[in-house]
Amino acid sequence: MTAMKGDSEDSIESMRPSNLQVFANNSTLHGMSHIFAYGHMTFRRFLWTLSFMGSLGLLMYVCMDRVYYYFEFPHVTKLDEVAAPNLTFPAVTFCNLNEFRFSKITKNDLYHVGELLALLNENYQIANPHLADPEVLTLLKEKASFNGFKPKQFNMTDFYNRTGHDINEMLLQCSFRGEECFPLNFTTIYTRYGKCYTFNSGLDGNPLLTTLKGGTGNGLEIMLDIQQDEYLPVWGDTDETSYEAGIKVQIHSQDEPPFIDQLGFGVAPGFQTFVSCQQQLLLYLPPPWGDCRSAPMDSEYFSTYSITACRIDCETRYLLENCNCRMVHMPGTSTVCTPEQYKDCADPALDFLVEKDNDYCVCDTPCNMTRYGKELSMVKIPSKASAKYLAKKFNKTEQYITDNILVLDIFFEALNYEKIEQKKAYEVAGLLGDIGGQMGLFIGASVLTILEIFDYLYEVLKDKILGSVLRKRRPHRSASDNLVIVSLHDFKISSVFLLASYMCFVCYIVLLNAACVYLPFVVGSNSGK
């Protein structure tokens, strides 16, 4: 009887869920039933064990390769042509390459800025008079006669505003989409070229202009007089004088200020210049997938971040730190540099910053920006047939028309825009899909297989740690029957532990996904700081 009882208990023990052979023979994990088959160790079981371990090793290698690839945060670039019913016309800023009109410079102006403009030397005498035209030299001698002269207070902002080229005199003709436009449609703005003007700036309170068609005649067309007879005589190398004649133009978004001295293109007199544009919407990824800046701009001058706003803000701070003043075109309410500060500090400091200092002004690319691709073509104006007509129309000589008149025609090539977007090449879903596919290929496992392993570990934990407690509470069986009687209390405990195990598994999956999603971003952000 005792032997029969022992055999019965061994049989029951071998059928426990925590028994490894029971688990292996019931698991969906491929190869486990052959490795832990009942009976003695055989060569066949050894081969199955070797194959399983080899497959498991390959699985770990491939999974680690996928994980490493994910943490490289790769991205791809998507290019798309998007048709639109209408497009917002860009802001168009232009500046005369000559900053100051010679006829508007007074004796007091010349006294204060003569040396800055290389018109006078340090002794307030005309520099290089042999280089001047007779008419210019005569006018300059009258203004440079300082005997008994008492200088008045001088203001650089007023000087730039008063002597800069006036759009009411420069603008000869203007049309947008075939309708006439006027100087009032242009906003005055200051750049390093002095007094400039922006069409469709959005700063005058008027709604932004749109275009409904592509091609010439559906954009902005202006005829300008660059007024070369007002150009300052050039007798030396300064930042305030120019060797060229014409205008500098920048086509930009209304969300960014013009940076025309660095990003503008030139338009020469005597030509009609056609500028065919295409709007480009650029979308970049933030760290760790890309290098763009998604944070708002930390500036007291600009609310919207852009590369040009960042550079202007940086240049302003650089001059305030090194010269204790700002240039006229720079934002803010700080003290404007005097002519002496311009010559001795501001101009040299800004030139050094732009040309040589590559570490001070480091501006990240914004995550969302609009750019305009351009194609330029030119034709000669005036033609021989129109020269006399234009001379009569504007009451000028034919030579003046050739030397001073230009036409600028800006339009969209077509009513569509390019969308260039960076996208994540490998996301969490792809990582989990690859790992799941490799698990199925090498060991035939799935998420439910992992659940089986958790369930088995729960059974082992219950038998090893709680077995003694459960056996003490198990009711005694009579020797006359083989029925196993389980109390309701034991069933409740088992159910609670099983539910807790499943909840732990669910939490594990959730935490794994959260770690995959948020940990890379946190690591990337900390490394960026």
UniProtKB/Swiss-Prot annotation:
Does the record bear Nucleotide-binding in its keywords? no
Matching entries from Pfam families are given as: ASC
Report how it sits in the membrane: Multi-pass membrane protein
Reported tissue expression: Expressed in central nervous system.
UniProt keywords (A-Z) are: Cell membrane, Cell projection, Disulfide bond, Glycoprotein, Ion channel, Ion transport, Membrane, Postsynaptic cell membrane, Sodium, Sodium channel, Sodium transport, Synapse, Transmembrane, Transmembrane helix, Transport
Q: Which residues lie on this side of the membrane: Extracellular?
A: 69-427
- Characterize the regulation of its activity: Inhibited by the diuretic drug amiloride.
Q: Which GO terms describe its molecular function?
A: ligand-gated sodium channel activity; monoatomic cation channel activity; pH-gated monoatomic ion channel activity
Q: Which residues are sugar-modified?
A: 86, 155, 161, 185, 368, 395
Q: Where in the cell is it found?
A: Cell membrane; Postsynaptic cell membrane; Cell projection, Dendrite
Q: Where is this motif: GAS motif?
A: 444-446
Give the positions of the site Involved in proton-dependent gating: 357
Which reaction(s) are listed as its catalytic activity?
Na(+)(in) = Na(+)(out); K(+)(in) = K(+)(out); Li(+)(in) = Li(+)(out); Ca(2+)(in) = Ca(2+)(out)
User: Mind listing the GO biological process terms from this record?
Assistant: cellular response to pH; sodium ion transmembrane transport
The portions of this protein that span the membrane are 52-68, 428-458
Could you tell me which residue ranges are on the Cytoplasmic side of the membrane? 1-51, 459-529
Q: Which GO terms describe its cellular component?
A: dendrite; plasma membrane; postsynaptic membrane
Q: Which domain of life is it from?
A: Eukaryota
Disulphide bridges in this chain? 95-196, 174-181, 292-367, 310-363, 314-361, 323-345, 325-337
**Assembly, per entry:** Homotrimer. Heterotrimer; with other ASIC proteins producing channel with different properties. Interacts with asic1a.
Record PANTHER family? ACID-SENSING ION CHANNEL 1, AMILORIDE-SENSITIVE SODIUM CHANNEL-RELATED
Q: Which comment does the entry carry about domains?
A: The second transmembrane domain (TM2) is a discontinuous alpha-helix disrupted by the GAS motif, which forms the selectivity filter by adopting an extended, belt-like conformation aligned approximately parallel to the membrane plane. This peptide belt encircles the waist of the channel and divides TM2 into two discontinuous helical segments. The distal helical segment of TM2 interacts with the cytoplasmic portion of the first transmembrane domain (TM1) from a neighboring subunit, contributing to the structural and functional integrity of the channel.
* NCBIfam families in the cross-refs: ENaC
Q: What biological function has been recorded for the protein in this entry?
A: Forms voltage-independent, pH-gated trimeric sodium channels that act as postsynaptic excitatory receptors in the nervous system, playing a crucial role in regulating synaptic plasticity, learning, and memory. Upon extracellular pH drop this channel elicits transient, fast activating, and completely desensitizing inward currents. Displays high selectivity for sodium ions but can also permit the permeation of other cations.
State the family named in the UniProt similarity comment for this chain.
Answer: Belongs to the amiloride-sensitive sodium channel (TC 1.A.6) family. ASIC1 subfamily.
The identity of this protein, by name, is Acid-sensing ion channel 1C
**To which species is this protein native?**
Danio rerio
